Amino acid sequence: MVEAGDFRRGLTIEYDGQIFQVIEFLHVKPGKGAAFVRTKLKNIKTGAVIEKTFRPDERMPLAHIERREMQYLYNDGELYYFMDTQTYEQIALNQEMVGDALKFVKENMTVTVLSHNGVVFGVEPPRFVELEVIDTEPGFKGDTQTGATKPAKVETGAVIQVPLFINVGDKIKIDTSTEEYLSRV
């Protein structure tokens, strides 16, 4: 059991006899009245997204989720193909199931495939990835303003904010959960 006040992104719960994954949550403490948690929940079977408000002390049962490490092979335009590195079994998932999970994932990287009772419903990227910057504005001598950033496109096509000293060809480390630059590699 988990309290609504402890919700976080990616958590899977049982609600109304269905399995839902928490996509977004917001703890709200109004000036008048009791606090509440506003959430967006995705039904893992249908893909439907609902908005629901809970009291922070409401308790929900956690759904048991199976996690399998799989290698991302390729995308054929419609489907994304993954292979279990232990059994060499391959599965294909559509864009809806994958979502933005592969935003920072290159072919042959290892990802976690999520399933419930044998039904695959999502993909989790590795927490940290190292990618090469393929396009960004050049930094100029004297760009020393603290905290200044610029957009940079990495080899997977995703765009993130990086410090001014990062140039094309640099390898950078990215936190995929926050989509933020961490360091130069």
UniProtKB/Swiss-Prot annotation:
Which GO molecular function annotations are given, in alphabetical order? translation elongation factor activity
The compartments listed are: Cytoplasm
Supply the InterPro entries for this chain: Elong-fact-P_C, NA-bd_OB-fold, Rib_uL2_dom2, Transl_elong_fac_P/YeiP, Transl_elong_KOW-like, Transl_elong_P/YeiP_cen, Transl_elong_P/YeiP_CS, Transl_elongation_fac_P
Q: In which pathway does it act?
A: Protein biosynthesis; polypeptide chain elongation
Keyword Chloroplast assigned to the entry: answer is no
Q: What is one term from the GO cellular component aspect held by the record?
A: cytoplasm
Key words of the record? Cytoplasm, Elongation factor, Protein biosynthesis
- Any Gene Ontology biological process: peptide biosynthetic process
Pfam families associated with the record: EFP (PF01132), EFP_N (PF08207), Elong-fact-P_C (PF09285)
Which PROSITE patterns does the entry mention?
Answer: EFP
Q: Record keywords: Cytoplasm included?
A: yes
Q: Which PANTHER family match?
A: ELONGATION FACTOR P, ELONGATION FACTOR P (EF-P) FAMILY PROTEIN
Q: Which NCBIfam families match?
A: efp, PRK00529.1
User: Of which family is this protein a member?
Assistant: Belongs to the elongation factor P family.
The entry's function note states: Involved in peptide bond synthesis. Stimulates efficient translation and peptide-bond synthesis on native or reconstituted 70S ribosomes in vitro. Probably functions indirectly by altering the affinity of the ribosome for aminoacyl-tRNA, thus increasing their reactivity as acceptors for peptidyl transferase.
The protein in question is named: Elongation factor P
Q: Which organism is it from?
A: Caldicellulosiruptor bescii (strain ATCC BAA-1888 / DSM 6725 / KCTC 15123 / Z-1320) (Anaerocellum thermophilum)
Organism phylogeny: Bacteria, Bacillati, Bacillota, Bacillota incertae sedis, Caldicellulosiruptorales
Q: Which gene encodes it?
A: efp
